[in-house]
Amino acid sequence: MKKRISVSVAAVATLSATVLSAPSSTAQDTPKDPADTWPSSNVRTTAPGSVAANKITPAMKREISRVVDTGRRAATRVTPSSSARALAGAQIRCATFESQRYCLRYGWTKRTAADLQRDLVQREARAKVAGHKSGDASILDSLRTHARMAPRAQVRADRAELRQAARATAKVLDLRHDIDGTPYPKGFFARHSEVERPAASASKRRYPKRYYVMNWRHTRQQNRSYWCGPTTMQLIAWGWHGGKKPKTQKTWARRLGTTTSGTSIGQMVRGVNKYTGYDKKRFAGRYIVLDISGYKYGKWLRLHKRHYSKYRAPIVTHPVLKARYFDYMQGWSGSGHFQVGRGYNNRGKNPATIGLFEPYNPRRFNSSAPYVARLQYHRAYQGFLANKAHPQQNIGV
């Protein structure tokens, strides 16, 4: 009798585990957009790729040394237990490469270091008071992690981050020239002969009405509540390398340095550049973290269209995962989050949508929560609001 009871308990446990992760009978992980096919039906001639990584000039080297030296002195004034304001003041420092500003621990921005130090601390403090728990790492988490490093290790990390940023300067200028109309600095092409000069007669680029990248069958749900970063990276790498099975989320969590606090967007971008070929010139070039705080909806949507159809590559989206922005969450909310942006549809009179691989399935962690499918075609304007609602207001492109 005891043996039969133990078998029954085991069977119930197995059934319960299955129910937690199984979809409802009506959920379908299949494309709702007929244009989302694989092999892709996209016209390849509309995808010219990005720009080559530029060389690090002597002026860039001097700027890197200036910012690193400032950090070397500041590192002795803070510890992991220092206040958020003190950590931000010591660690969020900015370099200027060819008139473009890059800030350590954040990304490419038009805001000053002082603005970022104030805005990020205030916005994340409000999010914390509201009881939000992130699946991504907050700026404060990143600052504390950096402060735990030995001083020499901090200097090496800062220098490596700035060198990677400096080599992406040409891409930033190319992107901002297309999106914002930012002019190239005087003498830029003379200093960077490796970068192709755009045609003087080139008109503003028009993008296809719809465009998708990546095999829609290559999806997975995240296995832990704070693994949206590793799962997003898993799917992006699977999209690049192909194969029947992707590397495990545990592998990606280790490679990205994910903790129970989550993964930073800087770690995500470095992962795409290191472990896939989407950073090649014929695709997206070196991925960057871009500040979208000053973007309105039209410019944000153009950024997405440009990336998918020109680069044929995914985007690391960075929204706050709230039901008010994502109706497919059916009232269930998360917080800071990563997804795979993989296309758009702006055809006809219907509102534009963004194609997503959504890693988060609430049913995986709570049997009473709704099932959320991996394939989503989400209203673009709501995605824009979710990105702007995130305390960091940035994206990986």
What kind of feature is each model-predicted range?
Residues 143-213:
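Long amphipathic alpha-helical scaffold segments
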Residues 33-173, 254-397:
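Conserved active-site-adjacent core of cysteine acyl-enzyme catalytic domains
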